[in-house]
Each structure stands twice: as structure tokens, then as C-alpha cells.
Regions:
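Gly/Pro-rich, tryptophan- and cysteine-flecked surface segments typical
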Residues: 20-452
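Sec-dependent, cleavable N-terminal signal peptides
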Residues: 1-26
């Protein structure tokens, strides 16, 4: 039996209560969550969902269900007790993929992240915040191993946290940066298992109005790629946080390539060992930081992709991307290692005309050959859905909108998609966007490259 383990942050408690690994509080909202599971095989999947409390006990009897061949299923509300705060492990007889949406204060703020199909003994967290223009972070670490996990969190400011109690198998532990002492406004972290157990992590960034979520990194890359960068685009901006997990400083050049708007340009910074630096945000705003060199023109509109094209000391890097629109919307995603990309990518949640929500598929060819990309969609009732096709050169990106006036018109759709590009490798992210002008209705997640 194959299994898919992932952290699912679920708070169904009354306003004012928090979550933590100690007596500290965490979280600016009261939270609810949904789970979207996609069956990747042409056979019926029998799945079992285990809901673990933070003490390692199961919250409810394991939930068994089936998903049809190449089909998908949404769990909302989730089948756990009211007030559940913990994590989830999904077991399946077929290969599956999953994405979770987090909703704060009755949908006033929203975020999204994908499941983890494996754990690591060491995780990198490139962006944490404490009191940064109203933003703080907290993160959950889940035990994906086979026994109790003892862990240590080392922050880039030189501080560390070593909990006395272990994380029980399948369970998660919360770390709240707002409640921890002596942090700068922006920093990073390394999470390690001190007894060799496998871990996974999800980070939540939030103000009192906006929420972002991304996963901790277990693997690094010399040249991370980012399939969607927005700058000065209807108020949207992007910040990329690149972390150097190596032993020496390295000069990192990021090359920006337009897909819809803008001109190709570059940005160069030196990232010390164990530190992280912010890219994209300042050069496109026209306020480059000291020590930064760039050919990007501030104030110009840009929609495209980005790639690390120079890493002078060949150090291991990870990249996390934040997209935001002032104090209204925000969403985050993990940058990709192109060497782990494949010819197909799975997108477990695609929407159009769904209570005002629609999605966009943002895809990048990270291989060395020009190829034709085709995206197909699971049926929604008897409504026929278009197949999207585009030929992309190496390092070229494309954005497809599932919205009124675009590919789907006014057709309501809630389902999933699979994109294929024979002869090359692709990566993708999905933006979910609602129509509200007062609530944070931007959610972003990474497309999943299935394991062969």
C-alpha cells in the first residue's frame, strides 16, 4: 500500500484560543481547512485518512473512502471532531496527490499548500518573520518517520529551540515566532531530527488580514526555478526568499523572463552561508538594496518566470515565493528543483465560477527541449471542458486563466487537471483567486510531479 503523508493545519476552535508546543499562543485567526485528493492512476483508489492530535492519539476512527480512476474528491468540512488541531496521514492503494486550503475567520484570509509524499531528517525554512510590518509566522513540524521524533530548530539569528518532548508518530508540533524571544524582523531556520526520524513542515505567514502558507524544504537545488513572478501587475508584487544552506557565501544571479508582460532582466546578490536574501521585490519597485545589482527597471509591469542562472560557489539553495497585493491578498509557493521535474504535473484543485473563485495555471518548461504542453481536466457533470495546448521553448512559461472571458467562460467547474509535455520537463503552480475586495482570497499551491 502506498501512503501520502502531509501536514494539515486545522483549527476549529473558538476565537482567542491558540496552538503551540508550550504555553505560548500561535495564529492570528480561527481556522478551518479542506482536503482535496486526486487519484493519479486509472484504477479505483481505496484511501484511509488518519487524523492525529498533537499528542499522537487519533482524533476519530480512521476514515475510509474510495476515489474513482483518475478522479478527485474534496473533504469539506473535514471528518474530524470540532476543535481538532493536528495533522493527517493519508494511505492509498494507488498513487495520489493532495492539496489543503486553510481558511481564517470565516474566509477573511485564506492560504493553500500541497501534501508531502516523503519526509526528511533536515528541513530548510527560508522565510520567517516577527513583527515585520505587521507579519508574523508560525510553523508545524510533523513526524513522518517510524518512531518518536526528537527535534532541534536552529534560527539564522543564532538562537535555537530544542523541545524536551518528542513528536509522536504521525503527529505535529507548533512553533510560534511571535512568542519566541530575540528574533529579527526577517530570518530563516533549519529543523533537524536529532534521532534520525523523518520530518515534514508547513509554514504560515500572516498579518491580521492576510495569510500565506508554504512547505519546508527537504531537498536543495543549485538553480531553483519559479514559474510565476508578478510585478506592478494590477497591484500585485512578488518577493523571492532564497536561502543558502551551504558552508560558504555565493553570488546568486536570478534571471527574469517575461511570458505576458515585461522585459528580461537580472538581479545579483551575495548570500552568506546559512542566510537568506530577498529577490524580485526591491528591483521591480525601483529601490535596489545596498550590495544588489540589477538590470530590471523599477515600476515596469512584469508577468513571467524566474530562474537562478548563476550560483558562483555552487552552494545548495532553496527558494520561497510570496505574491501579494498590498493589504488585500497574499499567497506563497515553493520554488522548484528542475532536476526533479518530470514530463507531467498534477493539479488537484482547479475552479471556475465557484462562488466567485477561479484559478490560473502557471507552467514553465524547465527542460532542454522545445515541447508541446497539453492540459486535460476531469469532467464536471456532463459539461465538456476544453483541452489547453501550448508549445514552449526551454525556460519559457505560460499562464492559463480559468475565468469568465478566458478558457472556461462562464462554466462552473470544480475538479482537477493533469498537464503533459512529452520530451521535456515541466513545473507549475496554481493561483486560486476570489472576487472579494475586502477579504484575502488569493491561495497558491505547487503542481505535483508524480513519482514514477
Amino acid at each position: 500500500m502506498k501512503s501520502l503523508r502531509f501536514i494539515l493545519i486545522l483549527l476549529l476552535v473558538v476565537a482567542g484560543l491558540g496552538i503551540s508546543h508550550s504555553s505560548a499562543r500561535a495564529g492570528a485567526f480561527t481556522y478551518t481547512s479542506s482536503i482535496n485528493v486526486q487519484n493519479l492512476e486509472n484504477a479505483t483508489a481505496t484511501i484511509t485518512l488518519h487524523f492525529y492530535n498533537q499528542d499522537g492519539t487519533e482524533n476519530v476512527t480512521p476514515v475510509e473512502d474510495t476515489i474513482g480512476p483518475l478522479g478527485s474528491k474534496v473533504y469539506f468540512p473535514i471528518p474530524a471532531d470540532t476543535g481538532f488541531n493536528g495533522s493527517v496521514v493519508i494511505e492509498s492503494t494507488t498513487q495520489i496527490a493532495s492539496v489543503s486550503n486553510i481558511h481564517g475567520n470565516n474566509y477573511a484570509a485564506n492560504a493553500s499548500y500541497v501534501s508531502s509524499s516523503q519526509g526528511y531528517t533536515k528541513l530548510l525554512i527560508p522565510l520567517l518573520m516577527k513583527g515585520n510590518s505587521g507579519y508574523n509566522t508560525w510553523f508545524n513540524v510533523q513526524n513522518a518517520g517510524n518512531g518518536d521524533a526528537f527535534i532541534k530548530v536552529t534560527y539564522s539569528d543564532g538562537t535555537s529551540v530544542t523541545p524536551v518532548d518528542p513528536i509522536k508518530l504521525g503527529a505535529a508540533m507548533t512553533f510560534d515566532q511571535a512568542a519566541e524571544a530575540s528574533h529579527p524582523k526577517v530570518f530563516s531556520a533549519i529543523v533537524e531530527s536529532t534521532n534520525g526520524q523523518l520530518l515534514a513542515a508547513t509554514v504560515v505567514e500572516e498579518s491580521t488580514k492576510i495569510m500565506f502558507a508554504y512547505n519546508g524544504f527537504g531537498a536543495t537545488a543549485n538553480n531553483p526555478v519559479m514559474p510565476l513572478i508578478n510585478a506592478n501587475n494590477s497591484g500585485y508584487q512578488t518577493g523571492i526568499q532564497i536561502q543558502n544552506s551551504g558552508t560558504v557565501s555565493t553570488d546568486v544571479v536570478v534571471t527574469y523572463k517575461p511570458s505576458l508582460f515585461g522585459t528580461a532582466c537580472t538581479e545579483t546578490q551575495t548570500i552568506p552561508a546559512g542566510q537568506s536574501k530577498t529577490y524580485a521585490l526591491y528591483p521591480f519597485a525601483g529601490v535596489p538594496l545596498p550590495g544588489m545589482s540589477t538590470t530590471c527597471v523599477g515600476g515596469t509591469r512584469f508577468v513571467g518566470s524566474a530562474k537562478v542562472t548563476t550560483n558562483s560557489a555552487a552552494q545548495p539553495l532553496v527558494a520561497e515565493v510570496n505574491q501579494f497585493k498590498g493589504t488585500l491578498n497574499g499567497g506563497a509557493y515553493d520554488g522548484f528543483d528542475p532536476s526533479t521535474a518530470s514530463a507531467n504535473v498534477v493539479l488537484p484543485l482547479i475552479m471556475n465560477a465557484n462562488s466567485g473563485y477561479w484559478t490560473s495555471i502557471n507552467l514553465m518548461n524547465v527542460g532542454g527541449s522545445t515541447a508541446t504542453v497539453t492540459c486535460t481536466f476531469t469532467p464536471y457533470g456532463a459539461v465538456p471542458l476544453p483541452t489547453l495546448t501550448k508549445t514552449l521553448a526551454p525556460d519559457e512559461g505560460i499562464s492559463w486563466l480559468q475565468a469568465a472571458g478566458d478558457e472556461f467562460g462562464a462554466t462552473k467547474y470544480i475538479g482537477s487537471a493533469t498537464c503533459n509535455a512529452p520530451g521535456t520537463q515541466i513545473v507549475a503552480i496554481v493561483n486560486e483567486l476570489g472576487a472579494s475586495t475586502t477579504a484575502d482570497q488569493l491561495l497558491v499551491y505547487e503542481g505535483i510531479n508524480p513519482t514514477p
